[in-house]
Amino acid sequence: MNSIVNFSQQLIQNFQEVSQKTVADSSNLKAFAYLGAGLAMIGVIGVGAGQGYAAGKACDAIARNPEAQKQVFRVLVIGTAISETSSIYALLVALILIFVG
């Protein structure tokens, strides 16, 4: 049990030393903020591909059954709005990292 406590104390001490060195260099901090913003925007790729696929399938469904156009369109709009929220959150995270970080 004592070795676990010593390990955790050493881990905390090492983390504090590293974080103090990193915060002292603001150019590294800004570079990491830009890197994080870029990584946050990777999530938008999947949303765009998914929305394109859904729109294509909706066009196929309307072509096969034109009478169901209103129902297919309603489901498409709701599904697109729900899937778009994740890309909006990714954009907000990226903007916060760039301008606040």
Curated annotation (Swiss-Prot):
Cellular component, GO annotation: plasma membrane; proton-transporting ATP synthase complex; proton-transporting two-sector ATPase complex, proton-transporting domain
Family matches, as InterPro entries: ATP_synth_csu_bac/chlpt, ATP_synth_F0_csu, ATP_synth_F0_csu_DDCD_BS, ATPase_proteolipid_c-like_dom, F/V-ATP_Csub_sf
Membrane topology of this protein: Multi-pass membrane protein
Molecular function terms from GO: lipid binding; proton-transporting ATP synthase activity, rotational mechanism
Keywords linked to the UniProt accession: ATP synthesis, Cell membrane, CF(0), Hydrogen ion transport, Ion transport, Lipid-binding, Membrane, Transmembrane, Transmembrane helix, Transport
Annotated transmembrane regions: 31-51, 81-101
Any single Pfam family the record assigns to this protein: ATP-synt_C
Superkingdom of the organism of origin: Bacteria
Site note Reversibly protonated during proton transport, residues: 84
Keyword Mitochondrion in record: no
Subcellular location: Cell membrane
Family: Belongs to the ATPase C chain family.
Function: F(1)F(0) ATP synthase produces ATP from ADP in the presence of a proton or sodium gradient. F-type ATPases consist of two structural domains, F(1) containing the extramembraneous catalytic core and F(0) containing the membrane proton channel, linked together by a central stalk and a peripheral stalk. During catalysis, ATP synthesis in the catalytic domain of F(1) is coupled via a rotary mechanism of the central stalk subunits to proton translocation.
Quaternary context: F-type ATPases have 2 components, F(1) - the catalytic core - and F(0) - the membrane proton channel. F(1) has five subunits: alpha(3), beta(3), gamma(1), delta(1), epsilon(1). F(0) has three main subunits: a(1), b(2) and c(10-14). The alpha and beta chains form an alternating ring which encloses part of the gamma chain. F(1) is attached to F(0) by a central stalk formed by the gamma and epsilon chains, while a peripheral stalk is formed by the delta and b chains.
PANTHER family: ATP SYNTHASE LIPID-BINDING PROTEIN, MITOCHONDRIAL (PTHR10031), ATPASE PROTEIN 9 (PTHR10031:SF0)
Name of the protein in its database record: ATP synthase subunit c
Organism from which the protein derives: Mesomycoplasma hyopneumoniae (strain 7448)
Gene name tied to this protein: atpE
